[in-house]
Amino acid sequence: MKSFCLLTLFLFISPFVTNAQSMDELLSSYVPATLKNPEGGKFNYRYSTPDKMEKGTKYPLLVFFHGAGGRGNDNKGQLVDAGGIGAFDKAGLTSRRNSHVFAGQVPKGERWVDVHWSLLGHKMPKVSDSMRMALEAIDAYASDEKNQVDPKRIYVMGLSMGGYGTWDAIQRRPDFFAAAVPICGGGDKSFGEKLKGLPVWAWHGDKDRVIKPSRSRDMIEAIKKAGGNPKYSEIKGRGHNSWTDAWNSKEMWEWLYSQKRR
């Protein structure tokens, strides 16, 4: 697990953010916030709004589930993890696509989904505290009228631990999201029928030794068997960093933001 975290930390530095100043500038464009519930729990998240918003217009929202390296309580790591913040800037999410971006943070020692990543399969467990509060925070953000979120264009994406989170979120809410991009994650194959109508594009490296590519293959196959038409990109020679391929794919971003829930 230590080597995995170090790999994640190394990878975020090089592909998408070049220096500390750039990182600080990008982070400053994301507003820090915390959801608190009556039971005393709290959930940290950051959000960024479209660069230009006009009254009466609705805008898309991208929900991002970070990987294990982004855990903590600094309300920064979730965007620094694997270079997500730089990738989103490069893709022009808030500028060219006029999109909201929402990124919550899992505390250290916790997970989006309470299953071990080395498993070759799992049944969907009880919702984790982090996932439950993330969904509550997303609901609050999306329903806030001042944010002008288009409920038919809410997208979800996540990598590694967040890839599991992405599958978990769409399994729990197959009719909430307009499209999903789970990257090197895994889900519950028995949900193929419920997910057959949701646009999904999964990514995995064929040399991934942290989370086996069979986890993505199995989910895609389950959806296809149920009559769905998911997309799947398995990157030849790639280890546990297929998010670099996904984020560098202009086709993926175009596909994602063209989706609209019926």
Enumerate the predicted regions with their spans.
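Primarily recognizes the serine-hydrolase "nucleophile elbow" in alpha/beta-hydrolase
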Residues: 143-196
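Bacterial Sec-dependent N-terminal signal peptides
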Residues: 1-22
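A domain-start/cap signature at the N-terminus of enzymes
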Residues: 18-61, 99, 130-133, 137, ...
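Gly/Ser-rich "nucleophile elbow"/oxyanion-hole loop immediately N-terminal to the catalytic nucleophile
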Residues: 52-57, 112-159
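Alpha-helical scaffolding within the catalytic cores
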Residues: 81-92, 184-193, 197, 214, ...
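Active-site machinery of serine-nucleophile hydrolases
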Residues: 68-132
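The conserved beta1-alpha1 loop
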Residues: 65-67, 204
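C-terminal catalytic histidine-bearing segment of alpha/beta-hydrolase fold enzymes
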Residues: 35, 183, 199-262
